């Protein structure tokens, strides 16, 4: 058993390598996001009608994205994503954010989804008519400048980590998707008796902002963050059919 990044890691093999040896370079790829300072705001499990390996493998490739997640073309450049292979079966995926699919026609003005992103940072979408591809770099600068005023600490993060999606798939069944002040932990678990079924867990973490910094800077968080729960939320469990029927959601991308 090992405690790292605010998580408890368990291995039941007495002959397994140490945690540090097993996770290898991924440790330095993840730890500067300060997961241990984040708090759980949502804990969900969906019961899926597929083998646990199938759903986990889906997150390791990007060929499906343009067909299954068409909205990503409006906020990410998935065709230029990079996939890195690590020892022990781990992989990483790096996706440019605050941009558009550069293999398609570049829009003259920010997309509707991108406009919402810009407005949430206090940026004017109208300033990016004819220069949509400048948004990503300007978002990096804006977040860097606003961080100390709004109570976030991005000192350990590189510029691209302020705009892009960094996803680390930890063999055999867990992945971590990282953003500057948010992380998604997702995990596939085998069904106890039926190999054609599994459980898919999604835990959402957020970095609580410093409210005192907001007051002293005379600025507001945009949008206002949801209140941080005082206690860990109870796990919400539902079925694949609940998601298909629109009764439950993990988020649009995971649902798809």
Where are these regions (language model features)?
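C-terminal catalytic domain of Rieske-type non-heme iron oxygenases
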Residues: 2-3, 7-256
């Amino acid at each position: 058993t090992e405690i790292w990044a605010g998580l408890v890691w368990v291995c039941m093999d007495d002959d397994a390598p140490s945690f540090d040896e097993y996770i290898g370079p991924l440790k330095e790829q993840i730890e500067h996001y300060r997961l241990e300072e984040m708090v759980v705001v949502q804990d969900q499990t969906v019961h899926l009608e597929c083998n646990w390996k199938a759903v986990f493998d889906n997150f390791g490739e990007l060929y499906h994205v343009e067909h299954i997640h068409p909205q990503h073309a409006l906020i990410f450049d998935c065709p230029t994503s990079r996939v890195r292979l690590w020892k022990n079966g781990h992989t990483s995926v790096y996706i440019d954010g605050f941009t558009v699919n550069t293999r398609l026609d570049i829009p003259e003005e920010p997309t509707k989804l991108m406009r919402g992103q810009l407005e949430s940072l206090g940026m004017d979408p109208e300033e990016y008519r004819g220069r949509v591809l400048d948004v990503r770099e300007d978002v990096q600068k804006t977040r860097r400048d606003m961080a100390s005023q709004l109570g976030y600490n991005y000192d350990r993060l590189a510029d691209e980590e302020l705009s892009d999606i960094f996803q680390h798939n930890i063999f055999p069944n867990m992945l971590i998707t990282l953003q500057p002040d948010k992380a998604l932990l997702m995990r596939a678990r085998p069904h106890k008796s039926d190999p054609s079924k599994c459980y898919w867990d999604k835990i959402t973490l957020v970095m609580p902002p410093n409210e005192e910094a907001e007051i002293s800077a005379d600025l507001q968080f945009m949008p206002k963050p949801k209140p941080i729960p005082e206690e860990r939320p109870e796990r919400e469990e539902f079925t694949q059919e609940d998601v298909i029927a629109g009764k439950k959601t993990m988020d649009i991308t995971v649902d798809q």
